[in-house]
C-alpha cells in the first residue's frame, strides 16, 4: 500500500521513479488540495495513483463555514509611459529583475502590508534580490513600534520556521516575509489574516497552495484577504510577461469561484 500526501508533488522524477518500482503496491491513495491543470501533470498523477476523485472544493468548504471567508484584491500596478517604453523589449528574467528592484513598488508593498489589521504573510520568490530588501524595509519602517517582523528563506531551518509559526499564532499584527518555496505548502498558520503575493507567478499549484496558508479559521472570526500584485508594463497592444501571468491567476480565481475585485494603482 502507498499513501502519498501532497500528491500533486508526485510529478517529480524522483517520486515517479519510486512509484514505478512499487509493482506490488496495488492499493494507492494520494491526497491533495490542489491539482495542476496541465494535462501532462494530470496524466502523471493518474498514472501513479489512479483516477482523480474530487471530494469537495475550496469554495464549498468556505461556504459551509469550514474554512475562513476569502477575498482576493487584485492590485494592478500601472507604470508610466517612460517605464513601459523602457521595458518593452525585456526578456522574462529581465522583467522580473526590473519589477523586484523597483523602489516604488517595494515601498507600496511595505506600506500596504503595514496598513492591514491582523497578521500578514508576504510571499516572495528571490531571496537576495527581493525578500531580504523587503524585510529590511519592514524593519526600518516599524522600528520602535514593537511590531514583530520575521524573515524566512530556505536557509532558515525547520525548527526556526516552526518557532516563527508558533509566535505568530500568539500575535495580533505580526508580519512574516517568507519565500514561496518555504511557506506556500504544508505550513498551517491558524491566526493569519492577510497574504501579499509580492512576486509574479502563473502556477495554479503555487497560487492555490499559497492561498491555503490563510484559510484556517481564526479565533476572532476575521476572514482572509489576498493582495495579488499585478504589473502592467504593456506597451501599445503588447502585454508584458507578468501581466499575462496575472491574467492567468484571475482565471484561476474565476474557476475556483473565489470572490475577487480588480483595482488599478498608479506607480
Regions flagged by a language model, labelled:
Residues 2, 6-8, 183, 200-201, ...:
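Conserved Walker B
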